[in-house]
Amino acid sequence: MKKVGTAFLTTLFIFSSFTSAHAEEKKDSKAFIDVSAATLWTAPDSLRPIDVPSATNPVDLWKWTKSMTLDEKLWLTNANKLETQALLGQEVTVVDKKGDWVKVLVHGQPTPRNEEGYPGWMPEKQLTYNQEFADKTNEPFVLVTKPTAILYINPSEKHKSLEVSYNTRLPLLSEDTISYRVLLPNGQKAWLRKNDGTFYRSQNDIPTPAADDLINTGKMFLGLPYIWAGTSGFGFDCSGFTHTIYKSHGITIPRDSGPQSRNGVAVDKEHLQKGDLIFFAHDQGKGSVHHVAMYIGDGNMIHSPRAERSVEIIPLNTPGYIEEYAGARRYLP
């Protein structure tokens, strides 16, 4: 180029016992992501023991990402084991099934690989289908605007349900002075602090961002460790980072760096503006694109670089990057 006592038992019952809610998946059926962020694999049953926390329901993405050594992270990249991530409530189309795994197409992540969505394999238990949620996917929603945020079972915020990612979208049911009441894809309800999200009546209600809006969003994630295929506040890859920044501001761009480099409006290096995406390619910038960053002005860029590092700001002319510069694209109007 993701909790003992009475309160625990209540939480366990409400948020873990979804047998009746899980979709009985059939080919080309629609479903919704039922975990904070589902990690999609290139093939089913590819998990190592260390990957199990990413494949449960609920997931524990912090445990997964923080427990991996560098070599274990590099294995995901070098062996090309992962495809992308999909966030809680995101719609997918199920196109195949092998045992307990399903192949899905993630809506809203454009790719030339499939016009319906980004393909990948995931555990079936991380999907659900609820008609009430399906009926409200085009209604007013709350967009999570913090790197991650906590959903609560009740407005008193005494009992946590789960931690969700930036850019998660959930239908709004009601609100009080400090919280939004939202609908979860399994049909349950939860509360989100208003400080952690923004209400929109529709997708078109999201205002066109200024370049500084995109940059400030990117800066929220400074220091977040890289994760191959990541598109969430639990970790990004390079193109997942730029895709998510733009999408959270109402602009959908391709999921991967190659297609990102072929869309938008081409920009000469001497005319770079804040918010432009800048690309890097093999063979001294003349081969296939392998990396993307966002230009933030004054000769600097912000990016999620690779498994050894975290989201950072560095000069565009940094050795190792400037030699592979392969052009820029503008997606802002």
From Swiss-Prot:
Keywords: Cell wall biogenesis/degradation, Hydrolase, Protease, Signal, Thiol protease. GO terms for biological process: cell wall macromolecule catabolic process; cell wall organization; proteolysis. One of its GO terms (molecular function) is cysteine-type peptidase activity. The active site is at C238, H291, H303. It holds the Pfam family SH3_16. Specifically hydrolyzes gamma-D-glutamyl-L-lysine bonds in murein peptides, releasing L-Ala-D-Glu. This is Gamma-D-glutamyl-L-lysine dipeptidyl-peptidase. The gene is ykfC.
